[in-house]
UniProtKB/Swiss-Prot annotation:
InterPro entries, per database record: Ribosomal_bL9, Ribosomal_bL9/RNase_H1_N, Ribosomal_bL9_bac/chp, Ribosomal_bL9_C, Ribosomal_bL9_C_sf, Ribosomal_bL9_N, Ribosomal_bL9_N_sf
First and last residue of the signal peptide: none
Taxonomy of the source species: Bacteria, Bacillati, Bacillota, Clostridia, Eubacteriales
Keyword Ribonucleoprotein: yes
Function: Binds to the 23S rRNA.
Name used for this protein in its record: Large ribosomal subunit protein bL9
Single GO term (MF): structural constituent of ribosome
Keywords attached to this entry: Ribonucleoprotein, Ribosomal protein, RNA-binding, rRNA-binding
Family in the record: Belongs to the bacterial ribosomal protein bL9 family.
Residues forming coiled coils: none
NCBIfam families on file: L9
Biological-process GO terms, alphabetical: translation
């Protein structure tokens, strides 16, 4: 009997897979536990619609991430910070600070988890990586200027 998996099942397959299962296994194990449903024409149609909608949504997210990457590419952020001897900062600049400054200066909302950088503790120029989507990333320049 052909069944559509509704959840990942160890050693059987992943959610959305269409597998061949024995009648007893399907009726006595998979169906009662809501792990699978019969692969009827109606259920296959629903599955295909879900997969198509997911594909369209991922494509839209990818396009939005690429557009955002183009907007941010080559931009820079200047931060004035109090420094001590040798340009060492009092405190540090983190990805949270950079995300807030991007929001303030460019009106673009970016999650701090998407900003890949080490904590900045010295004045100077730094290049940070922003991973907007698994295959879309961009670079920005952060300049730390000592406060007078």
């Amino acid at each position: 009997m052909k069944v559509i998996l509704l959840q990942d099942v160890k050693k059987i397959g992943k959610k959305g897979d269409i597998i061949e299962a024995s009648d007893g296994y399907a009726r006595n194990f998979l169906f009662p536990r809501k792990l699978a449903q019969e692969a009827s024409d109606a259920n296959m149609h629903i599955l295909n619609n879900k997969k198509e909608n997911e594909r369209k949504q991922k494509l839209a997210e990818l396009e939005a991430a690429q557009k955002l990457a183009e907007e941010l590419k080559g931009k820079e952020i200047k931060i004035k910070a109090k420094t001590g001897e040798n340009g060492k900062l009092f405190g540090a600049i983190t990805s949270k600070d950079v995300a807030e400054l991007i929001r303030e200066q460019y009106k673009i909302e970016i999650d701090k988890k998407k900003i890949v950088m080490d904590t900045i503790k010295l004045a100077g120029g730094y290049e940070i990586d922003i991973k907007l989507y698994p295959e879309v990333s961009t670079k920005m320049k952060v300049i730390i200027v000592p406060q007078e």
